[in-house]
Structure formats: structure tokens, C-alpha cells
């Protein structure tokens, strides 16, 4: 080694020693063994972390396998869980159907077999029923006697007693009854014959007197009303009239059945007048109801207002059932229970709030996690109560009601986002969409004080047809239903106008 090389080696060692000395002074010196240990520690930590992750993963797999078993068992459990969920939803749907009645759906109250006890808000007292002391009496008015008054003689001991004297005052009591008797009027016309032409002649009989024996308008009107208005069967009508006339008048079943056609033919002009008056009314109530003819469904449409009613027969519902009825030409406000067909006619529409309240009640019972329908029912019930007190709403009050209506529907939207509707009970969600889309039709009555907020007028009218249909069970021909509609149109209109129905029926029959 040369002197130059030795010097260079010494210089490098010196520099290395200086650097180590500097590190020792600053406290940054780490020897190689320590570095190796720290590296090993970091490696072991990474391996431990991976081991812990594997432990958790395998433990989770173990628990899953222990709970679910094999893949086949897991698939079977998933399948059964899905079936159980569907079964629970089906049970919920069936319970909903079982609990449907006239209080939470459009079912008529007559279909409920066992009604609840009707609530009575009167306070219970110990007073006897009838007239109360201190209250004005409501006596039956006395009538003009049709026979001489029967004066009751006093007892003989009263007459002979000088302490009693007549006061000139009388106590009168009357018996009102009806006297049923058979009246027979015979018309006789002498026959004349021409000696030359052998022509036969007799005086003309009154119009309608075509048969040798005819029934008068009184007996026809009675039989007609019993069968078509009182819903008495043809057999019972025949039996009743035979009984009250002491077997003197025995109407044939064919005659009783033909009275509706005679009445219909005699009142064509009256029904046309009803048709025209309905078109002039500011609002019209309309509704369909089904019937059956020889096992086949048919429809009856009612068009009514407080003064006129028209029943229309049709084989089908929808647009076909409206053809030829007043609704087809009507341009004012229609009141109905959300039959979409009606929205193609008329100039305005008012939904029946009685139906809406029942649908809201159904949603309350079947969607317990939601609250929007409770708020909406409270709003609608309050509006109806408010309308009964005052129908003229101010613009400010109408604006407040509309804002509350929108707020409830907005809240309903948020609730259905959190609790989506069940496929087995979509009625609540559908009601929400309907009330949102047809807001104006639900609140139209606020701006029109004369507009009714329910369709009860049409419902009551159709209930009379349903009673007749229930008594008849089924009709034999479309003509019989159409004739019944014609007769009910006249009778119901006359009843609304306060006319005497017996006189109305008599006017339709000549004899």
C-alpha cells in the first residue's frame, strides 16, 4: 500500500467517525441491530393484523354455516322466509277484506249482518217516555165527522141527582178509519140494427173501456203502488187486495205485472219534462248500481237533484251507460263518487266526501305506521261540520283550507317514501294520489255554497231500486227493469215535489 492510499483510507475512517460522533451528540444514532429488530417487529405486526382479519372472516363463515347449514339449507330457509312474508301479507289482505263494511268502504250498510248498537247522545233520565209535564202537547187534530155525531147519554143516577146540572160543554173523542167497499159501475148501450143494410150500431163506450169487465183506476193505482213502490210481490199484492175486498176482486198476476207498462206509456211526456229540468239544474247527482237479469249483470243510472229524479236502464256501465241520459248533454256541476267516466261530462265535478271519509278510515285501520290519513280525515270532518254551521266561506278561510290540504298531502308523500305501500293494500296510496290529482274536485264545494259535498241524494235514490231488486231477486227481462226505472222516475219526482202518490198513480190509468 502506498503512502497516498494509506492517507485516503485514514481520511474516510476519520469522516465516518465524525459522522457517528455527530449522531451520538444529537441522539439520532441507531445501530444496525436495532433497525433489524424494528423491521422484524413491523413485519410481525402486519402478519398479526392479517391473521386477525382472517380469524374474523373465518369466524363469521363458521357462524353463518352453523346457522344456515349447507348451501341447500340456506336456499331453503330463504325460500321459506319469502313464503312466510307473502303469507303474512295475504293474511293482512284477507283481514282487510273481512273488516270492510259501510263505515270504511263503499259497501252498503244492508250487507252488514250484525250492526253495532246505535249511539244515543241523549242523557239518561228516570222520566217515562211520551209527553212531559210542562211541555206543550201535540194532539192529533180533530177531523170533520162524516157521519152524524153520536151523543152519549148520561147515567140515570146523574140525571136524577139535583146536585148535577149541565154546563153546556162537551168532551169529544173521534175514531178515524177507512171504509173499503167495492164500487161497480155498469155501462149499457142498446143495440140498433139497420133493416136494409143489416148494419149494427150502439152508443160509444168511454175511452179505455174495451173489455166486458174492466178494473178502475183506484184498484189499479193501489196494485201498482204496492208492487212498484212498496216492493210487495205480485202474489202478496193479489192476496192483499183479494182480502180487503172480501174475495170480490181477484186481480190476475198478468194484470198486476202489466200495470208498470201502462204507467210508463202514460207518463212519457212527464219523463221528458224531468229530463229537460235536470239539464237546467245548477248541479246533478249521479251514480250507477248493478242489477241482474236472468243471471246477467245490468246497470241502473240515477240522475237527480232535490226536485227531480230520473232512473235510466243500461246493459253496461261507463260511456255506454251514459248514452241517452241527461249526463250526456249536461254542462253544469256533477256530484259523484269518483267514477272516472263522469269526468268526461259536465262542466265541474264534486267528489262525494262521505266516500272519501270511509276510504280514509280504511287506510287508518290498515296502515298503522302512517298518520297522514288521520290528519286528512280530521280536516274533512271538520269542514263538513263547519259547512253545517255556515256555507259562505271567506277567501282567506278557503286559502287556509287549501294550504292545510296541500301540507297533509306533502306529508303523506314523505311518509310513503319511508314506508312504501304494500302490494296487498295499495288503497291508501291510491287514495293519496287521487286526492292530490283531483284536489279541485274535493274542495269545489267551498266556493259554491249551494253545492252538496256528498252524493247521498243519489245513494238514497238508488237504495230504493236495491230494495225492489232484493225483493224480486232477479228480473226476467231488460224491459221489466226499464219499465221499473220509468215508474220510479215519476214516483220519486212526485214525492220530492210533495205530491200525493196515489193521485199520481190514478192519473196514469184511465180506468
Predicted regions and their residues:
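Short, flexible loop/hinge motifs at secondary-structure junctions
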Residues: 2-211, 257, 286
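Catalytic center-proximal scaffold of phosphoryl-transfer enzymes
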Residues: 18, 22-26, 35-38, 42-49, ...
Amino acid at each position: 500500500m502506498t503512502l497516498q492510499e494509506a492517507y485516503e483510507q485514514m481520511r474516510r475512517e476519520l469522516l465516518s467517525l465524525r459522522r457517528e460522533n455527530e449522531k451520538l451528540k444529537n441522539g439520532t444514532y441507531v445501530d444496525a441491530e436495532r433497525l433489524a429488530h424494528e423491521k422484524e417487529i413491523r413485519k410481525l405486526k402486519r402478519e398479526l393484523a392479517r391473521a386477525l382479519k382472517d380469524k374474523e372472516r373465518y369466524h363469521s363463515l363458521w357462524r353463518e354455516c352453523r346457522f344456515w347449514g349447507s348451501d341447500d339449507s340456506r336456499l331453503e330457509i330463504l325460500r321459506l322466509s319469502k313464503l312466510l312474508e307473502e303469507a303474512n301479507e295475504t293474511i293482512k289482505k284477507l283481514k282487510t277484506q273481512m273488516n270492510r263494511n259501510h263505515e270504511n268502504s263503499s259497501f252498503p250498510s244492508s250487507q252488514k249482518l250484525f250492526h253495532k248498537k246505535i249511539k244515543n247522545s241523549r242523557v239518561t233520565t228516570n222520566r217515562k217516555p211520551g209527553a212531559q209535564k210542562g211541555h206543550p202537547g201535540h194532539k192529533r187534530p180533530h177531523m170533520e165527522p162524516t157521519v152524524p155525531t153520536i151523543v152519549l147519554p148520561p147515567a140515570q143516577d146523574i140525571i136524577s141527582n139535583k146536585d148535577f146540572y149541565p154546563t153546556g160543554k162537551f168532551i169529544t173523542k173521534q175514531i178515524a178509519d177507512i171504509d173499503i167497499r167495492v164500487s161497480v159501475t155498469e155501462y149499457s148501450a142498446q143495440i140498433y140494427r139497420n133493416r136494409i143494410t143489416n148494419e149494427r150500431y150502439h152508443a160509444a163506450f168511454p175511452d179505455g173501456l174495451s173489455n166486458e169487465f174492466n178494473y178502475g183506476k183506484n184498484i189499479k193505482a193501489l196494485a201498482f203502488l204496492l208492487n212498484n213502490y212498496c216492493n210487495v210481490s205480485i202474489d202478496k199484492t193479489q192476496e192483499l187486495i183479494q182480502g180487503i175486498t172480501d174475495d170480490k176482486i181477484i186481480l190476475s198476476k198478468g194484470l198486476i205485472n202489466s200495470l208498470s207498462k201502462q204507467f210508463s206509456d202514460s207518463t212519457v211526456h212527464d219523463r221528458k219534462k224531468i229530463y229537460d229540468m235536470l239539464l237546467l239544474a245548477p248541479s246533478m247527482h249521479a251514480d250507477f248500481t248493478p242489477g241482474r237479469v236472468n243471471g246477467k249483470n245490468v246497470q241502473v243510472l240515477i240522475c237527480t237533484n232535490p226536485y227531480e229524479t230520473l232512473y235510466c236502464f243500461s246493459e253496461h256501465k261507463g260511456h255506454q251507460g251514459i248514452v241517452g241520459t241527461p249526463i250526456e248533454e249536461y254542462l253544469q256541476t256533477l256530484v259523484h263518487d269518483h267514477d272516472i267516466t263522469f269526468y268526461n261530462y259536465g262542466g265541474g265535478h264534486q267528489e262525494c266526501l262521505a266516500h272519501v271519509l270511509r276510504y280514509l278510515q280504511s287506510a287508518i285501520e290498515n296502515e298503522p305506521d302512517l298518520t297522514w290519513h288521520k290528519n286528512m280525515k280530521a280536516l274533512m270532518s271538520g269542514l263538513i261540520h263547519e259547512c253545517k254551521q255556515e256555507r259562505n266561506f271567506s277567501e282567506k278561510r278557503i286559502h287556509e283550507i287549501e294550504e292545510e290540504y296541500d301540507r297533509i298531502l306533502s306529508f303523506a308523500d314523505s311518509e310513503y317514501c319511508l314506508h312504501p305501500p304494500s302490494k296487498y293494500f295499495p288503497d291508501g296510496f291510491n287514495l293519496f294520489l287521487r286526492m292530490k290529482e283531483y284536489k279541485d274536485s274535493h274542495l269545489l264545494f267551498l266556493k259554491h255554497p249551494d253545492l252538496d259535498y256528498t252524493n247521498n241524494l243519489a245513494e238514497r235514490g238508488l237504495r230504493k231500486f236495491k230494495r225492489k231488486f232484493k225483493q224480486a231477486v232477479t228480473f226476467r227481462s231488460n224491459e221489466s227493469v226499464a219499465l221499473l226505472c220509468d215508474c220510479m222516475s215519476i214516483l220519486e219526482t212526485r214525492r220530492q215535489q210533495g205530491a200525493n202518490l196515489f193521485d199520481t198513480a190514478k192519473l196514469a190509468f184511465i180506468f
